[in-house]
Amino acid sequence: MAIQSKYSNTQVESIIAEVSAVLDKHQAPTDLRLMVLGNCVTDLLARKVPQEARAAVAEQFSKALAQSVKG
């Protein structure tokens, strides 16, 4: 999603492959996959982002997601 990242493409792609493999293992349909990933994002925000910054981080994330699917 990000144009520039402090993480390598290899690192990102490796994690994506592992997460995808777990979802494949459970034969999760697309709607369940999206629900699980959304819940992971919500949990991550709740645990790792200070409460006063959560709304702004969630908004920034949602804008980046929307931009990434525009092509």
From Swiss-Prot:
Transmembrane feature ranges: none
InterPro entries on file: UPF0352, YejL_sf
NCBIfam families, sorted: PRK13689.1
Family: Belongs to the UPF0352 family.
Protein's name in the database: UPF0352 protein Ssed_1809
